[in-house]
Amino acid sequence: MPTINQLIRKGRVSKVENSKSPALNKGYNSFKKEHTNVSSPQKRGVCTRVGTMTPKKPNSALRKYARVRLTNGIEVTAYIPGIGHNLQEHSVVLIRGGRVKDLPGVRYHIVRGALDTAGVENRAQGRSKYGTKKPKAK
């Protein structure tokens, strides 16, 4: 416990909170060729690698992921949600924040139904999260 004198001399230092999705907090000015501290809710990027990885214990699956080079020059690993996807190398995708708990190092999600990413086929519920259009009434 500090004394009053110690508090007067030093004061309390507030903790710095680290971002959970740091790649979204950096921008890039291509004219000046310099990084800027402009945050954005989503970012566009190009897939450099698409593959599957296995989750941590106790889960077992083949989770789909893509390595994405963003417009600010940072390369991140992003999860591809939903069943089936049409992504391959050089696909242009939109990423948002949000980690995948059982995949270490995956801090971003790819937005389905935006840019080159198709929505999930034959999805009836939770369609807005997977970029699926409303089915035609018969």
UniProtKB/Swiss-Prot annotation:
Residues 33-55 are annotated as: Disordered. Changing K56R: In RPSL1; KO-267, confers streptomycin resistance but not hyperaccurate translation, increases natural antibiotic production 10-fold. One of its GO terms (molecular function) is structural constituent of ribosome. GO terms for biological process: response to antibiotic; translation. Keywords: Antibiotic resistance, Ribonucleoprotein, Ribosomal protein, RNA-binding, rRNA-binding, tRNA-binding. InterPro entries: NA-bd_OB-fold, Ribosomal_uS12, Ribosomal_uS12_bac. Part of the 30S ribosomal subunit. Contacts proteins S8 and S17. May interact with IF1 in the 30S initiation complex. Interacts with BrxC. HAMAP family: Ribosomal_uS12_B. Belongs to the universal ribosomal protein uS12 family. This is Small ribosomal subunit protein uS12.
